[in-house]
From Swiss-Prot:
Homotetramer, assembles in a dimer or dimers configuration with two interfaces. Residues 83-93 have a biased composition (Polar residues). Coiled coil: none annotated. One of its GO terms (biological process) is mitochondrial calcium ion homeostasis. One of its GO terms (cellular component) is mitochondrial inner membrane. Changing G350L: Strongly reduced calcium channel activity. The chain crosses the membrane at residues 305-326, 335-355. It comes from Metarhizium acridum (strain CQMa 102). This is Calcium uniporter protein, mitochondrial. Changing Y340A: Abolished calcium channel activity. It comes from the Eukaryota. InterPro entries: MCU_C, MCU_fam.
C-alpha cells in the first residue's frame, strides 16, 4: 500500500510542474516547492549525440597536434617546448662571452667537456630552410650544447653526437644527416714565397718533421694559417694534441656557411686537475713523511740499541768467564762444561728463533724484524696509517707518470718541483718507488728459486717413475720367456 501511495504522489508532483518559460537565452523553470526560479545554462541544451560528436572532433584534432609535437620532441631535440626561453644561468659563461666560439674543457675525470654553440633557431626544421628564421634576436637562440667525450673515442663518435642535436639537411625533399668535418691547423705552409720568388720553409726542423706545441689557446695568434681535414677514425685525444699547435680547431657542418671555432686546450688545461690533485697529495705526503721519518728514526735507534745491548751482554759473559777461570778457585775444569752448554743453548735458541720467524739466518733479517715491530708500534702511537701512505705514494707516482706522458706528447717541459712542492717530496716518492721495485725483484727471485726447486723435484720424480716402469717391463719380459 505504501508503494502505491508513493508512486501516486510522485506522479502528481510531476503533473503539477509548470512548463518552462524561456526568457532570452537562459531557461527559467518555476517550482512549487521553491520560491526562487532556477536558471539553467544554455550550454546544457546540447544533446548527447552532438556532445559526443564534438568531443570526437576535438580529440581527433588534439591527437593530430600532439602527434606532430611529439614527433618533433622525439626526433629533433631542438624542437622541445620553451627551448628558446630557458632561465638564465647563474654560473659563469664557459664561452667567455663569445657566443660564436666553443670551448673544450678538462674535467676532474678523464672525460673532456665540449661546449659547442648551436647556430640554429629552435623552430628551424632544416639546416637549409628559410634563412629569415635564423635572424631572430639573441634571446631566442639555442643555448650552447655540452658533450662529454673520452679522449680515446674517435671523431666519428663525436660526429654522431652533434648530428643528433642539430636539424637535418633537406636534399631533394628527403631528410639527410649533415656531414661534420673537423679541421685543425696544419704544420706545413707549402712554403712561403720570398721577395725574389723563392720558397722558404717555415718549419725549421724540415718539411718532413711535424712540429708540436702545447700552448694551444695560449699560443700567439697567426695571421695566415693552413687547415687540414682529419679522418673520423682519429682518436679525439690525438686530434687535440695535434691541434694544440694552434689556438683553435674548426667544426664545419654541411649546409651551414659559417664554421664553428673551438679553442684548443693547452698542456696546462689538459693537466690542470691532475696537477691540482698532485699538489694536494704532495702536501699530505709531506706531512705524513715527517711523522714516518721520525718513527723510522726511533725504530732504527731502538734496533741499534738492542744490537749494542747484545754485544754488551756477550762482553759481560766473556768477562765473567775470564774472571771465574783465572781469578777464582773453581778453575777451567768447572767453567769449561758451563761454557759449552751455554754456547750450545745460545745456538739452539737462535736456530729456534729464526725458524719461528721463517727468515734467513742473517743479521739483516733479525734487524728487519726488530725494526718492523718497533715501527708498527710507533705508527700506531703517532696515528700514522701505513696503508694510506702506500696508497698516496702509489697515486702520486701514477699522476706523475700521466703528467710526464702528456708533457711528452705535447712536446713541453713540465716543472715538476712547482707541483710537488719541493725536493723532499720528490725524494720520498723516488725512494718509495725504488724500494717497491727492489722488493718486487726480490720476490720474483725467491719465486724463481722455488720454481726451480719444484722443477728439479718433479724431474727427479719423473725419472724415478720411468725407471720403475722399465724395471716392471723387464720383469714381465723375463716372466714370459719359456724355461729350459
Amino acid at each position: 500500500m505504501g508503494h502505491v501511495l508513493g508512486g501516486t504522489l510522485l506522479a502528481a508532483n510531476r503533473l503539477a510542474r509548470p512548463p518552462a518559460v524561456v526568457l532570452g537565452k537562459p531557461r527559467v523553470c518555476c517550482w512549487r516547492a521553491s520560491p526562487w526560479p532556477v536558471i539553467v545554462s544554455s550550454a546544457l541544451q546540447f544533446s548527447s549525440s552532438s556532445a559526443r560528436h564534438t568531443n570526437y572532433t576535438s580529440a581527433r584534432y588534439e591527437a593530430r597536434g600532439r602527434s606532430t609535437t611529439q614527433r618533433k620532441v622525439d626526433d629533433r631535440p631542438w624542437h622541445r617546448e620553451s627551448s628558446g626561453s630557458l632561465p638564465k644561468s647563474t654560473s659563469p659563461d664557459p664561452t667567455g662571452g663569445d657566443a660564436t666560439k666553443g670551448r673544450l674543457l678538462t674535467t676532474p675525470t678523464r672525460l673532456l667537456k665540449l661546449i659547442l654553440p648551436i647556430p640554429f633557431h629552435p623552430e628551424q626544421e632544416y639546416i637549409n630552410s628559410d634563412e629569415t628564421k635564423t635572424n631572430k634576436p639573441k634571446e631566442d637562440a639555442v643555448e650552447p650544447l655540452a658533450l662529454l667525450v673520452h679522449p680515446q673515442q674517435p671523431l666519428s663518435y663525436l660526429e654522431r653526437l652533434i648530428q643528433a642535436e642539430i636539424p637535418p639537411l633537406l636534399v631533394k625533399d628527403r631528410e639527410k644527416l649533415p656531414e661534420i668535418i673537423f679541421r685543425a691547423e696544419a704544420d706545413y705552409t707549402g712554403g712561403n714565397k720570398s721577395n725574389d720568388g723563392r720558397r722558404e720553409e717555415s718549419n725549421g726542423n724540415g718539411s718532413n718533421v711535424a712540429s708540436y706545441s702545447g700552448l694551444g689557446r695560449e699560443g700567439p695568434s697567426k695571421g695566415d694559417t693552413h687547415w687540414v681535414r682529419w679522418s673520423g677514425s682519429t682518436e679525439i685525444g690525438d686530434f687535440i694534441r695535434d691541434a694544440a699547435r694552434g689556438r683553435e680547431f674548426s667544426v664545419t657542418i654541411e649546409g651551414h656557411a659559417e664554421e664553428l671555432r673551438v679553442a684548443v686546450p693547452s698542456f696546462k688545461d689538459r693537466t690542470y686537475y691532475m696537477r691540482m690533485r698532485l699538489r694536494r697529495m704532495s702536501q699530505e705526503i709531506d706531512q705524513m713523511a715527517t711523522v714516518k721519518r721520525e718513527c723510522d728514526l726511533l725504530a732504527h735507534k731502538g734496533a741499534h740499541a738492542l744490537a749494542k745491548g747484545g754485544f754488551a751482554a756477550l762482553a759481560a759473559w766473556w768477562g765473567i768467564v775470564y774472571y771465574v777461570t783465572f781469578h777464582t778457585d773453581m778453575g777451567w775444569d768447572l767453567v769449561e762444561p758451563i761454557t759449552y752448554l751455554a754456547g750450545l743453548a745460545s745456538i739452539m735458541g737462535g736456530y729456534l728463533w729464526f725458524l719461528f720467524i721463517s727468515r734467513d739466518l742473517s743479521y739483516k733479517a733479525a734487524m728487519n724484524v726488530t725494526v718492523s715491530r718497533r715501527q708498527n708500534a710507533l705508527y700506531q702511537e703517532r696515528g700514522f696509517d701505513p696503508a694510506k701512505w702506500d696508497q698516496l705514494v702509489h697515486d702520486a707516482n701514477g699522476l706523475r707518470r700521466e703528467i710526464k706522458f702528456a708533457a711528452t706528447e705535447y712536446g713541453v717541459e713540465w716543472d715538476e718541483m712547482k707541483d710537488l712542492g719541493g725536493e723532499e717530496v720528490k725524494e720520498v716518492l723516488e725512494e718509495e718507488k725504488g724500494g717497491k721495485a727492489r722488493k718486487r725483484e726480490q720476490e720474483d727471485e725467491d719465486g724463481d728459486g722455488d720454481d726451480d726447486h719444484d722443477h728439479d723435484h718433479d724431474h727427479v720424480s719423473h725419472g724415478a717413475e720411468l725407471q720403475g716402469q722399465d724395471i716392471l717391463h723387464a720383469n714381465e719380459a723375463a716372466a714370459n720367456v719359456p724355461g729350459d
